């Protein structure tokens, strides 16, 4: 065996000037919540392709059947029709400017401007998503409370509300926060035990994403309000939205987002702006249920 090294050998302290710190090829971008509400609820953007900022949605109520007697005139129905007003009045933008010196020094493999542009587009699209989800607080029908975990009885009560209002069964979805799904609902044997899921492992097979046959849309964008965690059960037509057709806008599940770049000689840099112009409205109150649960 070789003898131990004596003094005077090279080490990391004496050779520090020759040991580089490496910026790796990997870049940690922030995680993005999938935007799902705008893909589910009714999009009326086509109504304003030719211009306009207000969409009127007429309401039709059910007529009344009357008894007809011989020799008498029929009883006429005279409906008073109301309307829902959707106003496009929310304009959100995300902008940044990259000076030439910064662009020259950026590590090229990071493709930083492309990543920042993608982030800007996502951020403004998320504003529409958040606005739609926040509308759940306007539903007059509610179940649950801030003090208790969401229970099976709350879920059934929410479904009963929509059934009583004759909301189409094939156009419904639950919107729930991950904490409510995994910390509360999955603690209910009916929804988690293998024996209660037709032999399919609910975790591996994704059965957690249906409650009584109704799809569950999981989103971390559902906030807390007055101490409880927001959630909802809604029909597709419960909420409506529209995005204005901004020149150069690109359609997607997050609505129409416009992304622009311009070289600004005054600052010797490239200005990038992502923006969206939209409006949201509760269209059918009886087609939605505000679900409240404890926040954790």
Describe each region flagged by the PLM.
Residues 137-209:
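Extended, solvent-exposed, turn-rich assembly/linker loops in the middle of proteins
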Residues 1-18, 60-67, 116-134:
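Short secondary-structure boundary segments
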Residues 57-59, 81-144, 166-176, 216, ...:
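Long, contiguous amphipathic alpha-helices that act as assembly "spine/axial" helices in icosahedral shell
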Residues 44-45, 49-53, 57, 79, ...:
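Charge-rich, low-complexity amphipathic helices
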Residues 21, 25, 110-111, 149, ...:
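Generic alpha-helical secondary structure signal
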Residues 72, 134-135, 287:
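Residue-level detector of alpha-helical recognition elements and their boundaries
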Residues 62-65, 70-83:
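Active-site-surrounding "flap" and adjacent substrate/cofactor-binding loops of secreted or lumenal enzymes
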Residues 2-44, 48-51, 58-62, 85-89, ...:
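Sequence/fold signature of self-assembling virion shell proteins
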